[in-house]
């Protein structure tokens, strides 16, 4: 009788949600999609000075092993189909961080005929990291914001 009361209140599913989201935030495996100068700052964030390993972040070489894509730099019209193809190869759940002014909205090259004005026109973006180029600290802050977003999602019972 007591367990049925807990089940009706959603206690068990809420606790399971917390455990699943905790595990997801502690094991983000990003796939780097470096397109321009922002990729240098993304590589800097992976260095020993910032130590992304303490957040459980391990860069993966293939999209089939990753659950986070970091788009860093200017996305051109010619590269957009490749970005979408790589995104489609990632397993669910998957997240995208758009890093830099060019990836967010075209940046300096906004009025160029060959530039996509924001990678959110190609793939759904979860976190935007502003800057030209954004610092490694800004990317680290964006990753922390993504972890907070993952913790607040409802994984088991979607409403």
UniProtKB/Swiss-Prot annotation:
Its cofactor is [4Fe-4S] cluster. It is an enzyme of class 7 (translocase). InterPro entries: NADH_UbQ_OxRdtase-like_20kDa (IPR006137), NADH_UQ_OxRdtase_20Kd_su (IPR006138). The keyword Iron applies. It catalyses: a quinone + NADH + 5 H(+)(in) = a quinol + NAD(+) + 4 H(+)(out). The keyword Transcription regulation does not apply. GO terms for cellular component: plasma membrane; respiratory chain complex I. Its EC number is 7.1.1.-. One of its GO terms (molecular function) is NADH dehydrogenase (ubiquinone) activity. Disulfide bonds: none annotated. [4Fe-4S] cluster binds at residues 37-38, 102, 132. Keywords: 4Fe-4S, Cell inner membrane, Cell membrane, Iron, Iron-sulfur, Membrane, Metal-binding, NAD, Quinone, Translocase, Transport, Ubiquinone. Belongs to the complex I 20 kDa subunit family. NDH-1 shuttles electrons from NADH, via FMN and iron-sulfur (Fe-S) centers, to quinones in the respiratory chain. Couples the redox reaction to proton translocation (for every two electrons transferred, four hydrogen ions are translocated across the cytoplasmic membrane), and thus conserves the redox energy in a proton gradient. This is NADH-quinone oxidoreductase subunit B. It comes from Ruthia magnifica subsp. Calyptogena magnifica.
């Amino acid at each position: 009788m007591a367990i049925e009361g807990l089940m009706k209140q959603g206690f068990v599913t809420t606790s399971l949600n917390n455990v699943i989201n905790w595990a997801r935030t502690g094991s983000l495996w990003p796939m780097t999609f470096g397109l321009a100068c922002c990729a240098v700052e993304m590589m800097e964030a992976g260095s020993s000075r910032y130590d992304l390993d303490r957040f459980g972040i391990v860069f993966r070489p293939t999209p089939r092993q990753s659950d986070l894509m970091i788009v860093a730099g200017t996305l051109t019209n010619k590269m957009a189909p490749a970005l979408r193809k790589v995104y489609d190869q990632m397993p669910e759940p998957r997240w995208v961080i758009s890093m830099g002014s060019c990836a967010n909205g075209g940046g300096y090259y906004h009025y160029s005929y060959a530039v996509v004005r924001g990678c959110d026109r190609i793939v759904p973006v979860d976190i935007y990291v502003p800057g030209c180029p954004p610092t490694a600290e800004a990317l680290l802050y964006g990753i922390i914001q993504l972890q907070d977003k993952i913790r607040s999602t409802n994984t088991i019972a979607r409403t």
